[in-house]
Amino acid sequence: MKKIISLIIIYLLVCVQLHAQLIKGKVVDEHNVPMPLVNVALLSESDSTLIKGVVTDKDGVFNIESHNHSNLLRFSFIGYQNFYKTCTENDVGVIKMKEISTELSGVTVKAKRPTIKMSLDKVTVDISNSYLQHLGKVTDILKRIPGLTSNFQLLEGGSPTFVLNGKVTTVQELAAIPSSEIKRIIVDSSPSAEYSASNKGVVYITTKTLLSNTLSSELSNASVFARHYMDMVDLTINERYKKVSNLLTVGYSYIKSTQIDNTTETVYLPQQTIESAKERRTHSKGNIFNCFYSMDWDINKRQSMGFQYTGNVSRTNEHEPTLQTMNGSEMAFSQWKDGNNYMHSTSVNYNNKIDTTRNLSFVADYTFQHSHDTGLADIYPVVKTNSEGRYHIAGARLSYRTQRKWADLSMGVFGSTMSSTGAYLYNTDAEDYKTNETLIGAYFSLSKRFKGFYLQGGLRMETNSRKLETNTSGMFTDSTEWHFFPNLVMKKNLTKNSSIGLSIGQTIARPSFSDLNPGLYYYDAISYSVGNPQLRPCITTNLKVSYQHSNFHVSVVYNKNKNKIIQLPIWTDVSIDNKNIKWIPINFDKSSTIVATAIYHYSLGPIQGDITGSFTKPFVKANYLGNEYSCGKPSWYFSVDGQWALSSYSMFAFDGSYDSGGNSTLFNHEKSWTMNLTYMHRLFKDKFTLLVAFNDVFHTDHGNNWTMKYNNIKTSMHTNGDTRSLIVKLSYNLGKLQLDKNKQTASKELLDRL
């Protein structure tokens, strides 16, 4: 009898286990960034009582066991809207959580979450929870983002693609947006094949969104005291009513600055040595007007549309008194330059969440830019220049994403076209130019996660057609090129808090119009430049190994370049207008670099920040004075920054960096270090925000000092710019206005978190 009972019990247990199913999925935020520690609850469909619960791992993945054919899952995370999903399959795909905000009248609520989150290939910075939101413009923030350098390059080498609210944008457009309207910035150093192969990584930038039926506005003024003066005034209006949100910012800047450049050139000839030195002081004045407008419309739960506009109008004046010496003979002259420029850029986007596993999106944009510059040099004979250009750029991208049991699939098609016309006048020598360029292509990417392992592979195809011509050189470029760019990313979870990864990809750097145009451009009394129509695009193969443990990330990258484009000086025996040094871009067949980087995010009580370091070793050889010259001097870079909440109304921040100098291809840079200090204080119940910043406190930024050697010419540059400055910014928050009588309330869960 006991045996029979035992067999029955075993049979029932086996039946239960056989009937059980394992439900799996992945949770991401609105920017497809994996969300760890999200609560996943299995609820009873009849009365929503809790059956069991789990949390997602650091990659946003969860597994929960169920004995029912139909299941109700609830996803919750503090600061995000609860998400419910009924499922009958084992794989629920990707769950996208939507963030909420809290508005409490008369109460100052301070969040305690960290400002920086790190994963194997991404650095996420919460700008809205950092002093960075008060710095000025988006470009001021980017200079202080871990993983980026002060000139907007990736720390591990290469230029990123900037994406604002899903639209590819430029640094010029980002300079129009106040930092106070930025919510989050993500640096992705190993992106998929979706974005341009001309850039190595992607920087995602997201603006803020208000609660429904709310209007807010802010007025700010920033003054920069350096050798001269700069003043920036910005007005921001952010509004959301029902399903439509609008963001408008207008700004005006007045700039007055001075930069001192000292250039030396030494030419070693068989019979003599020619030494030239030039000191140029550039006194600049400028007036800039910026405008940015963004509109988002939630058509329904699945569909949304958006519109963006960026406008920029500027007028600049430069006066450059110059002293040039060649073999003891001095020549003093001045140059005056006037510039007028305006740019208008618009884009529309549409997003359709077809169902929980499929998404379709479309983006189209158009940009028009016009520039007109005049110049005068009081040398003998007098030189007058006049240049004008008009640029039209249009593009579109259609993307489709779906999550399947066998893999996640992303694919799309894209195209863009650019046309420009213009003219350049040097005294009586005139050159008219016309360019047409078209880029079309497609991409697809597959990704799969299984047993702590992640695999993503993709392929991008681009075809580029160019027609470049001038009235003096005729049609000097008429070409069509096809390129395929493979992409592979592999990740493995070693423990709950650590992972390792490998990524392989390729990028391309195409020569610009000025690189290809054989026409002359005059530098100074002894130098001129020409383009090289024979230039080939540079293809770079990138291999990266990464390791991440909690708040520490380290990577080693090997970049191999084929046909690297470098502009070099060459001595010509036959002079042109008494000028014998010709600068011309050429292709270097082979060059490579190894870059090792490390980022650590720390938190010490009220102080949190990050420590960043990198080591770069180039491998390139050139000819100098008849011998093979190796340019392989390594360089070190180290930076540390932090913010310290002194009280609930004040904060102190610092950031410093050291660059040991070293070779960048053929340019040997000098060492440099900087220190910036920032103090922020809120006044009158957060109505006023005062920010005081000291940039380059010790005036030690020599980042533009370099020496280059090639063939029989040695040239150097020493720049003394307006890097040391005092910034005083005062912002006035005009407050928030409810647009209807329905009060917004924060959930208890959210309040408990803050």
Model-predicted regions and their roles:
Residues 435, 508-562, 581-594, 717-724:
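Outer-membrane beta-barrel signature, preferentially recognizing the C-terminal barrel domain
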Residues 288-316, 335-471, 493, 497, ...:
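Face-selective signature of the C-terminal outer-membrane beta-barrel domain
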Residues 196-203, 211-262, 286-289:
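Outer-membrane beta-barrel translocator/receptor signature
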Residues 90-96, 106, 110, 138-141, ...:
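N-terminal periplasmic accessory domains that precede
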Residues 393-397, 441, 536, 542, ...:
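Outer membrane beta-barrel strand-and-loop segments of large Gram-negative receptors
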Residues 41-43, 76-80, 92-131, 189:
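Short, acidic, small-residue-rich periplasmic hinge/interaction motif at the N-terminus
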Residues 46-61:
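Short, acidic Ser/Thr/Gly-rich low-complexity loop/linker segments typical of extracellular
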Residues 150, 165-192, 237:
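Short acidic/polar hinge/loop motifs at secondary-structure boundaries
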